[in-house]
């Protein structure tokens, strides 16, 4: 139960290979993904907490569906169709992830449809300062090829800002196994968005070639984290939006692959969105509740690959 007395429901999606995904209606969250290594050994490969209450307003938003707007809005101010809106400032001088009571910290309505779980909520006009009533669905499918598909659907009656995503952290060596800095990443991206000192995009595109942010071929995170490259050093690690090469609206395309050499596990990310945020868990230490493995996470114990849009009145957003 939540502190407000709302029921928390856990769902398990299991396939014929023995892999499984566990979800909860609190934050439309992924709380466990169990998948085999190259020897067939099953391990949980996403971060999470030992007790349900650990998910209540956790700063890491571990595994949860974030909105209305994932990431930061400078000074909590935005202009939509010529009108200025003020939002909660909850991250230094910025608005982050839709505010304190964002979608990650709410109970979603939930139901089972055949072999998938559908979760939904309604965000009223003015919720957290945003214009328009917003109706949201998150659909979770898991098949026998170990493919987990998350589809976000959103519809509004006023033009608004919507940026929905799932904030799952992977550790493909297994949850609780330590640092992910030796994981290897390949991205279909040759450019990144420049960020200012407040981690707000400036609108300028930077070439990744020749820098520690060039992941067009597999490379681990460790050399970049250890470098003096200012775009990484200033944020204590990777916390940057990478622009997807060849992106086309509403087309599901391959963004990249994360792999862990020792176990042989890998995750290939596909998305219909124009960019992906890579975050190496730079601030996990000290801020997380007791973990599933009974300890506390250190910085860099998980990596999030977060796909990141204006939604106009009476349009429907479909985000895969």
Where are these predicted regions, by residue range?
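Acidic (Asp/Glu-rich), glycine- and aromatic
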Residues: 151-180
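Active-site/ligand-binding surface loops and adjacent short beta/alpha elements
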Residues: 176-261, 266
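Acidic/His-leaning functional-site neighborhoods
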Residues: 98-103, 108, 245, 251-308
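Short, well-ordered beta-strand segments enriched in hydrophobic/aromatic residues
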Residues: 11-13, 23, 140, 148-156
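Active-site loop/turn microenvironments that scaffold catalytic and metal-binding pockets
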Residues: 43-103, 200-201, 205-207, 213-215
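Extended, loop-rich substrate-binding clefts of extracytoplasmic carbohydrate-active enzymes
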Residues: 1-7, 12-16, 84, 88-145
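Conserved small/polar residues in nucleotide/adenosyl-binding loops
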Residues: 309-319
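Beta-strand-rich N-terminal accessory domains
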Residues: 1-49, 68-70, 74-85, 271
């Amino acid at each position: 139960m939540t502190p407000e007395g709302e029921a928390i429901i856990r769902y398990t999606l299991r396939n014929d290979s023995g892999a499984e995904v566990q979800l909860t209606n609190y934050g439309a969250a992924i709380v466990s993904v169990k998948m085999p290594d190259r020897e067939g050994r099953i391990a949980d490969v996403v971060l999470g907490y030992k007790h349900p209450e650990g998910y209540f307003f956790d700063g890491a938003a571990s595994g949860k569906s974030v909105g209305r707007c994932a990431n930061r809005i400078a000074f909590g101010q935005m202009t939509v169709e010529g009108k200025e809106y003020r939002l909660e400032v909850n991250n230094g001088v910025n608005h982050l992830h839709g505010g304190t009571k964002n979608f990650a910290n709410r109970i979603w309505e939930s139901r089972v449809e055949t072999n998938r779980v559908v979760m939904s909520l309604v965000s009223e006009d003015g919720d957290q300062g945003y214009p328009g009533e917003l109706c949201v669905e998150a659909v979770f499918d898991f098949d026998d090829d170990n493919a987990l598909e998350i589809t976000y659907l959103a519809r509004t009656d006023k033009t608004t800002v919507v940026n929905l995503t799932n904030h799952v952290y992977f550790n493909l060596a297994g949850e609780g196994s330590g640092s992910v800095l030796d994981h290897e990443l390949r991205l279909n991206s040759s450019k990144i968005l420049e960020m200012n000192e407040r981690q707000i995009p400036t609108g300028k595109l930077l070439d990744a070639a020749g820098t520690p942010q060039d992941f067009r071929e597999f490379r681990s995170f460790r050399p970049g984290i250890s470098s003096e490259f200012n775009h990484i050093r200033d944020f204590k690690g990777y916390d940057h939006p990478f622009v997807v090469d060849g992106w086309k609206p509403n087309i599901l395309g391959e963004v990249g692959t994360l792999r862990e050499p020792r176990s042989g596990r890998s995750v290939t990310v596909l998305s219909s969105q124009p960019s992906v945020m890579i975050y190496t868990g730079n601030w996990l230490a000290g801020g997380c509740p007791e973990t599933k493995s009974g300890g506390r996470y250190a910085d860099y114990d998980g990596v999030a690959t977060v796909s990141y849009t204006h939604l106009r009145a009476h349009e429907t957003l479909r985000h895969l």
